[in-house]
Amino acid sequence: GNKERTFIAVKPDGVQRCIVGEVIKRFEQKGFKLVAMKFLQAPKDLLEKHYCELSDKPFYPKLIKYMSSGPVVAMVWEGLNVVKTGRVMLGETNPADSKPGTIRGDFCIQVGRNIIHGSDSVESAKKEISLWFKREELVEYQNCAQDWIYE
């Protein structure tokens, strides 16, 4: 239902290029609910756990270096089909394949600098959320706009 959650992170290049507010704005305007957010320099061990499935890829060392090159904004968003819809809002992993109107389609050019991460499934969202956030950092609250967003 509308309690599904996803993990969204603005990567170091997105932070440096000042698109954090734009990302938050788009998720808010869509009607999703912000559940958690933190600004941090991600430790290498956290990034290695986050990207463990890519550890055998040739680009892996560059990916870890890029993701630890500056601070990131880690967020949890909640709402109906938020994982799938969030991925559509982000655009394709490769910005060259992303349509205008998507975050990557509007703000980036190259796959190695694709400014944002979004969970690719409900399962990976659960894993990523528990990796980046403690349970008590996920805020439970009633958002009064929800009645105007869902039937």
UniProtKB/Swiss-Prot annotation:
Keyword Zinc-finger part of the UniProt annotation = no
Q: Which UniProt keywords apply?
A: ATP-binding, Kinase, Magnesium, Metal-binding, Nucleotide metabolism, Nucleotide-binding, Phosphoprotein, Transferase
Give the catalysed reaction(s), semicolon-separated. a 2'-deoxyribonucleoside 5'-diphosphate + ATP = a 2'-deoxyribonucleoside 5'-triphosphate + ADP; a ribonucleoside 5'-diphosphate + ATP = a ribonucleoside 5'-triphosphate + ADP
Root EC class: transferase
Q: Which residues bind ATP?
A: 11, 59, 87, 93, 104, 114
Answer whether the UniProt record assigns the keyword Transferase to this protein.
yes
Q: List the InterPro entries.
A: NDK-like_dom (IPR034907), NDK-like_dom_sf (IPR036850), Nucleoside_diP_kinase (IPR001564), Nucleoside_diP_kinase_AS (IPR023005)
EC number, as in UniProt: 2.7.4.6
CDD domains reported for this sequence: NDPk_I
**Subunit organization:** Homohexamer.
**What is the name attached to this protein's record?**
Nucleoside diphosphate kinase
The protein's organism comes out as Ginglymostoma cirratum (Nurse shark)
